[in-house]
Amino acid sequence: MNKIESRHRLIRSLIMEKKVHTQQELQELLEANGVIVTQSTLSRDMKALNLVKVTENNISYYVINSIAPSRWEKRLRFYMEDALIMLRPVQNQVVMKTLPGLAQSFGAILDALELPQIVATVCGDDVCLIICEDNPSAIECFDKLKEFAPPFFFSK
């Protein structure tokens, strides 16, 4: 087992044994077990392990999120980071503009995700038209797809 795997195993074990409230607390627990990590390394580890903070009786602590993203969600995020040009709702549709040749890939991924808001996708070379039941469904679909867009994509 390499260094990263053993550190991940230790983090999982610490999270399951004890309610860890902060990243600093987790870092101190790791140090108490002989593992020194920087804050940035710990952040990457926490993301890789899919740790999320939950609140119970006004007390927050980390748990392992057992609902891991699907391979289709990962693929959508990857494509959106590399090939998304524009995304916007238009009445009961969402228009997705992509790099040339990739719209059909987006359509296939969206179809595989089976999002409840999407009735159908119609794709050309660089545009994927996402058809929804009604205007509110299109806004809901747009909001869901925005979650997969790269940070700051909509602040351009």
Curated annotation (Swiss-Prot):
<keyword id="KW-0804">Transcription</keyword>
<keyword id="KW-0238">DNA-binding</keyword>
<keyword id="KW-0963">Cytoplasm</keyword>
<protein>
    <recommendedName>
        <fullName>Arginine regulator</fullName>
    </recommendedName>
</protein>
<comment type="function">
    <text>In the presence of arginine, coactivates the transcription of the arcABDC operon, with other regulatory proteins such as ArcR and CcpA.</text>
</comment>
<comment type="pathway">
    <text>Amino-acid degradation; L-arginine degradation via ADI pathway.</text>
</comment>
<keyword id="KW-0056">Arginine metabolism</keyword>
<dbReference type="Pfam" id="PF01316">
    <property type="entry name" value="Arg_repressor"/>
</dbReference>
<dbReference type="InterPro" id="IPR036251">
    <property type="entry name" value="Arg_repress_C_sf"/>
</dbReference>
<dbReference type="GO" id="GO:0005737">
    <property type="term" value="C:cytoplasm"/>
</dbReference>
<dbReference type="InterPro" id="IPR020899">
    <property type="entry name" value="Arg_repress_C"/>
</dbReference>
<dbReference type="GO" id="GO:0034618">
    <property type="term" value="F:arginine binding"/>
</dbReference>
<dbReference type="GO" id="GO:0003700">
    <property type="term" value="F:DNA-binding transcription factor activity"/>
</dbReference>
<keyword id="KW-0805">Transcription regulation</keyword>
<dbReference type="GO" id="GO:1900079">
    <property type="term" value="P:regulation of arginine biosynthetic process"/>
</dbReference>
<dbReference type="GO" id="GO:0019547">
    <property type="term" value="P:arginine catabolic process to ornithine"/>
</dbReference>
<dbReference type="GO" id="GO:0051259">
    <property type="term" value="P:protein complex oligomerization"/>
</dbReference>
<comment type="similarity">
    <text>Belongs to the ArgR family.</text>
</comment>
<keyword id="KW-0010">Activator</keyword>
<dbReference type="InterPro" id="IPR036388">
    <property type="entry name" value="WH-like_DNA-bd_sf"/>
</dbReference>
<dbReference type="InterPro" id="IPR020900">
    <property type="entry name" value="Arg_repress_DNA-bd"/>
</dbReference>
<dbReference type="Pfam" id="PF02863">
    <property type="entry name" value="Arg_repressor_C"/>
</dbReference>
<dbReference type="InterPro" id="IPR036390">
    <property type="entry name" value="WH_DNA-bd_sf"/>
</dbReference>
<dbReference type="GO" id="GO:0003677">
    <property type="term" value="F:DNA binding"/>
</dbReference>
<dbReference type="InterPro" id="IPR001669">
    <property type="entry name" value="Arg_repress"/>
</dbReference>
